[in-house]
Amino acid sequence: MRLTRITRVVLAIGLLISLTSVAKAAETPPSEQESIGGTPPRLSFTKGEVSFWRPGAQDWSQAQVNTPLAPGDQLYTGPQGDLELQIGSRAFVRCWANTQLGLENHEPDFLQFKVTSGYASFDLRTVEPGRTVEVDTPNAAFTIEHPGYYRVDVSAERTSFTTRRAGQATVIPAGGEAVIVEPSEEVVISGTENPQVTSYAAPQLDAWDKWNYARTDHLLDAVSARYVSPGVYGVDDLDLYGTWRSVPTYGTVWVPRGVPAGWAPYTTGSWMLDPYYGWTWVDTAPWGWAPYHYGRWVSVNGFWAWAPGPVVVRPAYSP
């Protein structure tokens, strides 16, 4: 009985904070809401050693899936590490081993990353008109405004940047002039002072490129996409970890599989202080993004279900 009461208290607190956050967001003037992108980049996948650092932290900590990134955040993959960020409903950033990636800026139409070392891919199946993704390295900056597959490899004295699938970008070497990177092209920037820029035909896809292609194809083939708004992140996880049901009052809802008896929302995770959104729920379940940032949880015949709400063009993100 006591455990049941504790669960109810925790759930009530979680739902209260969530509803307060939604109300606060609704009261915020549009100019303030639009000063940062509507949905933060989501850490959607990790494998092996992946570390996270936020400005003000004493040290690096283990990265947690479903963490929303804020400007200034840093991620690092160890020798056997991999990570994935979702930055759009059809756009992903992935890092291979020994890579440091930072989020420098996040605005409605501008997303800026910095790759200090290692290997990063930007698989952008869609880029909204007017939106720019910038990738900074120690000796050059790359701007992307078109869908495509982009890969950047960074070492101490050399950066290579490759475009594929009709991708096109602009490179500005440190202290140099802008150069267009055409589709299926590789540019290599050598040196940090007065860097030299050379261009080649894009090399053949390697094993990591092929893995990136296949993973994105898989993520975009989610059945759950039929039931949620197109801008919702983490839809593929709903296929793997739950089922959809039609119930009176709420219509089509999603029910998680494999949760223990007596489980309730807001009991498997923690609140993180986001520098822009304030207190934000970070759930430890791999599926714990969409059900906590869109729609609402409802109790149906003794079990909890997520009601995504009506399908809209631009769903509102809630911390």
Sequence positions of predicted segments:
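Bacterial N-terminal signal peptides that target proteins for export
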Residues: M1-L11
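N-terminal targeting leaders that route proteins to membranes or the secretory/organellar pathways
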Residues: L3, L19-A25
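Functionally constrained cores in energy, signaling, and assembly domains
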Residues: R8, P41, T46, A63, ...
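Bacterial N-terminal signal peptides
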Residues: V10-T20
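Generic structural signal for beta-strand residues in well-ordered domains
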Residues: S18, I36, L43, P68, ...
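Flexible, surface-exposed loop/linker segments and immediately adjacent secondary-structure boundaries
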Residues: A25-E186, R215, D221
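Low-complexity segments
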Residues: V188-P319
